[in-house]
Structures are given as C-alpha cells and as structure tokens.
UniProtKB/Swiss-Prot annotation:
Positions of acetyl-CoA binding: I80, Y81, V82, N119
Source species: Acinetobacter haemolyticus
Keywords: Acyltransferase, Antibiotic resistance, Transferase
Subunit structure: Homodimer.
Full protein name: Aminoglycoside N(6')-acetyltransferase type 1
Length: 145
C-alpha cells in the first residue's frame, strides 16, 4: 500500500472517493478541492493499492475551540473514506497516523473529529481508531425577522 498527498494529478481519484463520502455536486467538490490544495492548514491523503485509490483522508488544523478538546490548535479529521473491500485492513489507521504526524508539525497535542448522532458506523470506526467520545451536541438555528 502507498499513501501520498493528494495533488492536481490525483484529482480524479480523490473526487471519486470524496463523492462516496459526501453527496455534493462534482463542481462543488472540485471547487473545494482546489481551495484545499492551496490551504496551508489542510491535509489530503490518498491510499493506493495496486495503483487503485482505495481510501482518502481530509484533515485540518483548527485554531478555534473544538468541542471536547482542551488545547489549541487541534488537528481535526474532516473526513475519511475507505472502499468497502479494504475496510478493517489497517488503511484507516495508517492514514490517521500520518495525519497525526502532520498535525504535530503545528504543535497540536490533540486530534479530534465529529460524526452525526445517528451515524453509528462512523462512531465504531472512530473508536477503533483510538478516538474517545467526548460529548454530544445538537445545533440549533433561528431566522432573524
């Protein structure tokens, strides 16, 4: 297995995996992907097996308060996706470890993430990667008249 940073040359592979994780339009994904590639505090990794992209990870450095953490800045897992045939093979663990090494370069001592309340598959994955649940939050909004 080979893990490498995403680049302009790997946009097609990254987009294919990203579409499986988040259901935005291709144009929206591509616009955000180009922005992320230029962002100093963003990391995008792709894992390959036999020249096929099998997993992706997106992480960032967050300087604002991150729920459940005690320090700042914090490495933050924005998203991770592994093709079903390659799950439970250790690829997600390898991606997370590389993201943690990257986050340490920014003096991070914590790595955080979030998941929807009803996404129990994501909760299980986070636990298997060493994350601990810290709190549950429900966000509210209201239109101002």
């Amino acid at each position: 297995m080979n893990i490498k940073p995403a680049s302009e040359a790997s946009l097609k592979d990254w987009l294919e995996l990203r579409n499986k994780l988040w259901s935005d339009s291709e144009a929206s994904h591509l616009q955000e992907m180009h922005q992320l590639l230029a962002e100093k505090y963003a990391l995008q990794l792709l894992a390959y097996s036999d020249h096929q992209a099998i997993a992706m990870l997106e992480a960032s450095i967050r300087f604002e308060y991150v729920n459940g953490t005690e320090t700042s800045p914090v490495g933050f897992l924005e998203g991770i996706y592994v093709l079903p045939a390659h799950r439970r093979s250790g690829v997600a663990t390898m991606l997370i470890r590389q993201a943690e090494v990257w986050a340490k370069q920014f003096s991070c001592t914590e790595f955080a993430s979030d998941a929807a309340l009803d996404n129990v598959i994501s909760h299980a994955m986070h636990r298997s990667l060493g994350f601990q649940e810290t709190e549950k939050v429900v966000y509210f909004s209201k239109k101002i008249d």
